[in-house]
Design a protein with these regions (language model features):
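N-terminal glycine-rich phosphate/adenylate-binding segment common to multiple enzyme folds
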Residues: 1-3
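Phosphate-handling active-site elements
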Residues: 91-93, 118-132
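Charged C-terminal helix
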Residues: 126-179
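Short, small-residue alpha-helix embedded
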Residues: 39, 102-125
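Glycine-rich beta-alpha junction loops
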Residues: 36, 72-76, 98-101, 133-136
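Short pre-catalytic strand/loop immediately N-terminal to key active-site residues, enriched for Gly-Thr
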Residues: 92-105
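Conserved phosphate/ATP/ADP-binding segment of small-molecule kinases
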Residues: 7-91
């Protein structure tokens, strides 16, 4: 689910309506941040508490999407964030990670790409979600700020080598990442 905060309201609404009617019926797993999905799928929500991942999954299922991965839910503490794969019947996977400082750009895209790749390889949905979330957590942990702006996930964190004291590795460049 792309962020549309920079769009004017009317074109954004037209886009969201088209997305709802044309794309959701063709979607197996909808991936999105809790507040974005809430505003889009449940704009008239009147509950005393924010909608749960299951509430959002019900709304997505009404449009033809059987699974919804909701990210950015309040975790068990202020320092944690919860991510849940839900259906209208219940929560299939719930993974909690430590919350990172900073504002990230590309986290949702990184998660969606990782999940898509794992599913394309034939990984079971619940396993793919857990692995994709673990990959995202590491990409964010190794994230970098290329300038004065937001932090980008380091999607190639796994390919970086750490410099050790071994003589054979003294010529390798050191890697440095900032959060």
């Amino acid at each position: 689910m792309p962020g549309l905060s920079w769009w004017d309201e009317e074109p954004a609404e037209d886009y969201l309506d088209a997305f709802r009617s044309l794309v959701l019926p063709q979607t197996t797993v909808l991936v999105g941040e809790h507040h974005q999905l809430w505003r889009w799928l449940l704009p008239e929500w009147s509950g005393n508490k924010p909608p749960t991942a299951r509430d959002i999954a019900r709304a997505a299922a009404d449009a033809g999407t059987p699974y919804t991965l909701v990210t950015g839910l309040a975790g068990p503490s202020e320092q944690h964030v919860e991510n849940q794969l839900a259906t209208p019947q219940g929560i299939l996977v719930s993974v909690s990670f430590e919350r990172f400082e900073g504002v990230f750009v590309g986290a949702g895209e990184t998660l969606s790409a990782a999940l898509t790749g794992l599913l394309a390889l034939g990984t079971e949905l619940e396993t793919a979600v857990s692995e994709a979330l673990g990959y995202l957590d590491q990409a964010l942990a190794h994230g970098f700020r290329p300038g004065m702006g937001h932090v980008l996930p380091d999607r190639l964190f796994w390919a970086q080598t750490d410099v050790t004291e071994d003589d054979d590795e003294q010529d390798l460049p050191a890697t440095s990442n900032t959060r």
